[in-house]
């Protein structure tokens, strides 16, 4: 790896940009709106002007986190849309003025994994929650006005008017698509829809169970609906989620708080005469992964986990059940999607009125209101809140 810190030998003709950013300086404390400096892009990098950015629960998770991989001060945010302001050397995919989606999942197009249709896990830039640029060691493109380094987040850091990304994390898109809708495919909607469409490959007429009807679970429901699932059963502790879920294709609902003596899996197995074809765990609980696995049908059932539990959490499965029941358990990161291949396909499905994105956006606010938006997310009052830059 090279040292990519900005210095006087930077060959780019572009200069540092001074702009506003919402900086997370201490765990759980309100973000600080301040002016920062954004360095020019290095080779294979792109500097973009953010048009709008959306909030994701991953932002809240790392805003709260007090142990590694948390680090401060940091610029969070990873679901956004922007316009290319400048490019570093060796960047050929995009040019100044292109509309792009930043993605936390790299798609380098060069490694064995990116060239294979079997995986979306880039081996050249393995996914990790690093505070640095992915191509260069210990390298940030952000500093505050005192010269202190500000850390990156998930290869994106969209809570800033300008940000710098590796070209592996940028997807060029049609500029005519409404920004507040297109940005959703930068993370959340792609993750859920892709889990149903690409990871699980949900079949027409199948039965799907979704644990957790937050934004990701609702996106899974949307994906299952697009795939033609005949039954989409939502499981949640909040009964009001059923009414919301119905807009996304949820056909039935199980309130896990009112199952009395029966486990949720027992209720689901009775409802489905032996188990669902596909189960999705969207909460981030190892115990729910086990429950989802118990809900899926022997012989062909698939359990897909999308949530993240605390580090070190273990999933315990009976080895007899694993051997004799022939089920599949797998993880799905970014819905198994290759960003540069699949995002344009999803955008076309939006333009053809198949993929419904409008219903995900419940709030639109100014960037300066970001702390109010965080509160809405913490209180469960929004699905997706889009923040517009000035």
Curated annotation (Swiss-Prot):
**Range of residues in the leader sequence:** none
Q: How is this protein annotated for GO cellular component?
A: cytoplasm
- Enzyme nomenclature, EC number: 1.1.1.1
Q: Which cofactor does it need?
A: Zn(2+)
Which superkingdom does the taxonomy of this entry point to? Eukaryota
The enzyme class is: oxidoreductase
Which Pfam families does the record associate with it?
Answer: ADH_N (PF08240), ADH_zinc_N (PF00107)
What name appears for this protein in its UniProt entry?
Alcohol dehydrogenase-like 7
Question: Cofactor binding mode, per the note?
Answer: Binds 2 Zn(2+) ions per subunit.
What positions does the entry give for Zn(2+) 1 binding? 56, 58, 78, 187
Q: Which UniProt keywords apply?
A: Cytoplasm, Metal-binding, NAD, Oxidoreductase, Zinc
The protein's matches in InterPro entries, at most eight in alphabetical order, are given as: ADH-like_C, ADH-like_N, ADH_Zn_CS, GroES-like_sf, NAD(P)-bd_dom_sf
Among PANTHER family, the record links this protein to: ALCOHOL DEHYDROGENASE (PTHR43880), ALCOHOL DEHYDROGENASE-LIKE 7 (PTHR43880:SF7)
Assembly description: Homodimer.
In the record, the note on similarity to other proteins reads:
Belongs to the zinc-containing alcohol dehydrogenase family. Class-III subfamily.
Where along the chain is an alcohol bound?
58, 78
The record's subcellular locations are: Cytoplasm
**What is the scientific name of the source organism?**
Arabidopsis thaliana (Mouse-ear cress)
Catalysed reaction(s) here are: a primary alcohol + NAD(+) = an aldehyde + NADH + H(+); a secondary alcohol + NAD(+) = a ketone + NADH + H(+)
UniProt binding sites for Zn(2+) 2: 108, 111, 114, 122
Task: State one molecular function term (GO).
Answer: zinc ion binding
Q: For NAD(+), which residues are the binding ones?
A: 58, 212-217, 236, 241, 306-308, 334, 384
């Amino acid at each position: 790896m090279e040292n990519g810190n900005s210095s006087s030998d930077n060959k780019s003709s572009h200069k540092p940009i001074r702009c506003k950013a919402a900086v997370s300086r201490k765990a759980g404390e309100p973000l600080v709106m301040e002016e920062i400096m954004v360095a020019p892009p290095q080779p294979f990098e792109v500097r973009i002007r953010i048009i709008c950015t959306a909030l994701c629960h991953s932002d809240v998770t790392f805003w709260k986190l007090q142990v590694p991989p948390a680090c401060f001060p940091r610029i969070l945010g990873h679901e956004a849309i922007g316009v290319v302001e400048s490019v570093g050397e060796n960047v050929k995919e995009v040019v100044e003025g292109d509309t792009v989606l930043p993605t936390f999942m790299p798609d380098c197009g060069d490694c064995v994994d990116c060239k294979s249709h079997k995986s979306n896990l880039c081996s050249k830039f393995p996914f990790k929650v690093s505070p640095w640029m992915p191509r260069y060691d210990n390298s940030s493109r952000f500093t505050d006005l005192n010269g202190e380094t500000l850390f990156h987040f998930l290869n994106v850091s969209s809570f800033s008017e300008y940000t710098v990304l590796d070209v592996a994390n940028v997807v060029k898109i049609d500029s005519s698509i409404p920004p507040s809708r297109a940005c959703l495919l930068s993370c959340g909607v792609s993750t859920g829809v892709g889990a149903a469409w690409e990871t699980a490959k949900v079949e027409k007429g199948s039965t799907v169970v979704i644990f957790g009807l937050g934004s990701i679970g609702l996106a899974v429901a949307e994906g299952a609906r697009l795939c033609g699932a005949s039954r989409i059963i939502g499981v949640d502790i909040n009964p009001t989620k059923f009414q919301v879920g119905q807009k996304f294709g949820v056909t039935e609902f199980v309130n896990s708080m009112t199952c009395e003596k029966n486990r949720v899996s027992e209720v689901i197995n009775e409802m489905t005469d032996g188990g669902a074809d596909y189960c999705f765990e969207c909460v981030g609980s190892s115990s729910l992964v086990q429950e989802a696995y118990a809900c899926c049908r022997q012989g062909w059932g698939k359990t897909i986990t999308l949530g993240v539990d605390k580090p070190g959490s273990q999933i315990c499965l009976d080895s007899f059940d694993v051997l004799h029941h022939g089920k599949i358990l797998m993880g799905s990161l970014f819905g198994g999607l290759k960003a540069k291949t699949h995002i344009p396909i999803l955008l076309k499905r939006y333009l053809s009125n198949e993929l419904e994105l409008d219903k995900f956006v419940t709030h639109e606010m100014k960037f300066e209101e970001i702390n109010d938006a965080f509160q809405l997310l913490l209180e469960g009052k929004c699905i997706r809140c889009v923040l517009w830059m000035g």
